[in-house]
A protein has these predicted regions:
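N-terminal structural segment of carbohydrate-active enzymes
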Residues: 49-187, 195-206, 210-225, 231-273, ...
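C-terminal motif of bacterial Sec signal peptides marking the signal peptidase cleavage site
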Residues: 43-44
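Glycan-recognition surfaces
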Residues: 369-450, 457, 464, 468-471, ...
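Active-site neighborhood of glycoside hydrolase catalytic domains
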Residues: 287-386
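Loop/helix patches that line or flank the sugar-binding groove of alpha-linked glycan CAZymes
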Residues: 438-441, 446, 450-610
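Short, acidic/polar
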Residues: 94-108, 324-340, 459-463
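Hydrophobic faces of well-ordered beta-strands that scaffold small-molecule active sites
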Residues: 67-69, 116-118, 188-190, 347, ...
Length: 647
């Protein structure tokens, strides 16, 4: 009897235990499922803050905004600090490919950078003796500076010998840099300059069967569709008359400086001058390339059919496959494909608007067929041509210089009203993601120069606007993030811009470089703070629709002045941002920022309070929504910015 009862109880306990296990498993599975659904729901739902209610962070964005870091390769790794005007590379030093180390690349990547534009890599004209490896001398009278313009390319199938430890092995050293860059998770962009080349173009490195520019030209005529150059028949080239007390090499004696340069017949100059004697301010060190446009402007090549602005690059590629195109087009396609084979991920095209859009359709469709993810950037300054170069020319990105850059610079430098920002974005709203934003590059004056802002901190609100106002890529120029002034008298180059024509050191960059440690060891505290600001900002990826709230607040908000600029980004099912900037370097502002009804309705925010967190410095605030309108208490100091995210 007792044995029977014992066995019965034992079975019952086992049954109860089994039930407990099953219950535990089911409840935990349900909890896991519930928590998963709840967590996913948080990505797409916002709930007003209630009493004792915790704020849950959203999942981080998966995709990363493109950030380009422009390196002027000849200057980047240079440790020499003498900075003698017109100095030789032995005196003033020169950067090498090998100076761009894994450590340097990792520190650059930490800034939020995705792409590096290695500027000045193709072999260009320069004053130096490399005859021992088969390179002919360049005449200083048609070289700007001693180091030379990077946009007077002499050999498209090799790289600047100055950049190599072993100039005879220069191409291999560049390939190693490409691989090193890729190994550090970064993409490589390099220059192609289709509009013009050096007056003495001479490729000694071209693959077998590739002809030099002009090799088969008929130089007895001004124009032929298959000539690479335009000619001035029966007239020889004459050097320009120098101005402003200029002398080649600063007046230094040189065996090739004799007042003449042999070119007969003369060729048109790079900026389009048709005179056998260009002016001093012409691009006299270069010659204009012929893309099949006659001197009277006729296009002597096939035209894209109507509607092709809406077609894919694949369709453009198929269109050109059986078409006869000018010889110069063929040469540049060969050049681009050559560098793609070397591992380059994209190109920055110099003065792209001086070359017909049909050529870009031809070239860029071929590039995209080879590498659909290639990064294609055009230097262009004509807003009326923007859409053609994007849609017909298949450019990924264009310089946003004459609209956003100029507007922001005028606010920073000249105290212009921030009212000018919104009209720029309105004008570009259909192509805003195609516009590359920047506040510095090799052509522009340094922010920290006295000719621009003098103090680099004065441009930080502009940098915030530039980086966050759209999905466009952001570009910064090496040294910008540590307040480089570009104040040196380098020789040909003038102070305020870091010279691209001379051998020179870049002082603030050198302090960050710290003799190759790349740890900022010589930077001042202010420079360290500046770099940290850039690092925080460039790692922030703001997405979603841009809505201007500046003009609404100008009308409806007391104490909201035209030194402030506010806008929103975001989507109803995603992250939402309210961005506020104070461009004044002396005034603080205290006001109740209004979020108008169109934003609240677009975001579908119910009434209530919403926690805000600034992504720059983690300060907090509250968004109050009532009657389909929002408000935020803002107390903003001089040159301060908030990138508020609704948590």
């Amino acid at each position: 009897m007792y044995i029977f009862m014992f066995l019965l109880l034992k079975k019952a306990n086992i049954f109860v235990s089994l039930l407990s296990i099953i219950k535990y498993f089911i409840m935990n599975k349900l909890n896991i499922l519930f928590m998963s659904i709840f967590s996913l729901g948080l990505v797409h739902c916002y709930k007003p803050i209630g009493k004792n209610e915790k704020v849950t962070k959203q999942l981080s964005e998966v995709s990363q905004k493109k950030v380009v870091y422009q390196i002027f390769t000849r200057l980047f790794g240079n440790k020499e600090t003498k900075n003698i005007p017109w100095g030789t590379k032995e005196q003033n030093g020169v950067g090498k490919f090998e100076d761009i180390t894994d450590t340097a690349l990792q520190e650059i990547k930490k800034l939020g950078v995705t792409h590096i534009w290695y500027t000045g890599v193709p072999h260009h004209a320069l004053v130096g003796d490399y005859k021992y490896i088969g390179i002919s001398d360049d005449d200083p009278e048609v070289v700007k500076g001693r180091a030379g313009s990077p946009y007077a390319v002499k050999d498209y199938y090799n790289v600047n010998p100055d950049l190599a430890v072993n100039p005879a092995n220069r191409l291999a050293e560049y390939e190693q840099l490409i691989q090193r860059t890729h190994n550090n998770g970064l993409k490589v962009i390099m220059d192609i300059v289709p509009n013009h080349i050096a007056r003495k173009y001479e490729s000694i490195s071209a693959p077998k069967g590739v002809q030099n520019f002009g090799q088969t030209d008929n130089s007895t005529v001004v124009f032929d569709v298959d000539n690479n150059f335009y000619y001035v028949p029966n007239q020889s080239f004459v050097l320009p008359k120098y101005e402003n007390n200029y002398l080649p090499l600063g007046g230094e004696k040189h065996k090739m400086i004799d007042g003449k340069f042999e070119e007969n017949p003369a060729k048109w100059t790079g900026n389009g001058s048709r005179s056998p004697q260009p002016n001093f301010d012409d691009w006299y060190e270069t010659v204009k390339l012929n893309f099949g446009i006659s001197p009277d402007g006729e296009k002597e090549f096939p035209q894209l059919p109507k509607g092709y602005e809406n077609e894919s690059y694949e369709k453009h590629y198929q269109f050109w496959k059986d078409k006869k195109v000018p010889n110069t087009w063929l040469k540049f396609k060969e050049i681009a494909l050559f560098w793609l084979e070397k591992g380059v991920d994209g190109f920055r095209f110099d003065m792209a608007e001086m070359v017909p859009v049909e050529f870009w359709s031809y070239l860029n469709s071929a590039i995209k067929m080879k590498n659909p993810k290639s990064f294609l950037l055009a230097e262009i300054y004509n807003p009326k041509a923007y859409r053609d170069y994007i849609h017909k020319g298949k450019m990924d990105y264009l310089y946003d210089k004459v609209q956003l850059y100029d507007t922001l610079r005028n606010i920073v430098q000249r105290g212009h009203s921030t009212d000018g920002i919104a009209p720029v974005q309105e004008d570009l709203k259909d192509i805003s993601s195609h516009m590359l934003h920047f506040l510095e590059n090799h052509d522009e004056q340094r922010i920290a120069s006295k000719e621009f802002a003098e103090k680099p901190e004065k441009a930080l609100p502009a940098m915030v606007v530039s980086h966050t106002i759209s999905d466009a890529p952001t570009m910064i120029y090496f040294g910008q993030e540590v307040g480089e002034e570009g104040a040196e008298n380098a020789g040909f180059g003038s102070p305020s811009r870091t010279s691209i024509f001379d051998y020179i050191g870049v002082p603030s960059h050198q302090k960050w470089m710290n003799n190759g440690k790349f740890d900022g060891g010589q930077l001042s505290n202010n420079q360290k703070k500046l770099r940290e600001y850039y690092k925080k900002l460039l790692n922030i990826d703001v997405k979603g629709k841009y809505i201007d709230i500046h003009h609404y607040n100008r009308k409806h908000t007391p104490f909201y002045k035209d030194k402030i600029y506010a806008f929103t980004r975001g989507e109803k099912g995603g992250k939402k941002y309210i961005i506020v900037n104070n461009f004044s370097s002396i005034e603080s502002f205290d006001f109740q920022l209004q979020i108008p009804e169109n934003v609240i309705k677009y975001w579908q925010l119910p009434e209530g309070k919403y926690a805000l967190k600034d992504k720059l410095f983690e300060s907090r605030s509250i968004l109050q929504v009532k009657d389909n309108k929002g408000s935020i208490k803002i107390n903003i100091k001089p040159l301060e910015s908030f990138i508020y995210e609704i948590e």
